[in-house]
């Protein structure tokens, strides 16, 4: 990497201890001398918070929130800390606290970014291929395309075996933020994520920078193990952010897209009423629609507090 600039790694942490193993691994890999950690303590309990604080040092900054403000706010704070502490950096690596990189994850991202930028300066991001926690040969996604009208992502190479796909770098609408190398120049021109707590923040940014003439890629040369999101097992409060943020994203593309998002939620609520499955999610979607109309955004705690327990049993 030209000039041996530092490579900040932003890791938001909420309730997980995986970060300690991740930091140890990255301190021993190829770019160890350049890696700088920005750990976001996202309102953790006192014991974990104290352990996170102990990571502070020459190569690590710890930013603490008094409460869980969500992944969006954590990554925003991490990007702001990067600008303050490592202003010379050209790239920033976003890494979820439950993502498990390997020794080649970061080198492959950097090498792919450098190769692409040498040919085209307007490369906004390069994402890792996400592989299954149950079978590391099975691809979950290698970036994705996204339809704002359908409100649906179409993951690349999903379900394929990694050895069968081989080493490829492909153009995508967005790549998952669980392991994403971001070009600081794109952030300076296009801005960073909006604070929407969780979900659709990385998708919206990927679509936004694309509209502004930047390009996003994903590569199978870089892999990361990450748990797959299962909407069936998610707490009802998650539905609030799925609905609220899909409406927010759809609103950037016009009334037809918003109408489509509202209709999808109508069908979900109707199915819940008819079958009795996930009926507790209905008031969260209703709150999401009311908040979208009023321009209100909430944290997880605020969402749960706003929905009466009689309407949302098991919401926590």
Give names to the regions the model predicted.
Residues 39-50, 67, 99:
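A conserved acidic beta->alpha catalytic loop
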Residues 15-29:
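Short, well-formed alpha-helical segments that are part of the catalytic scaffolds
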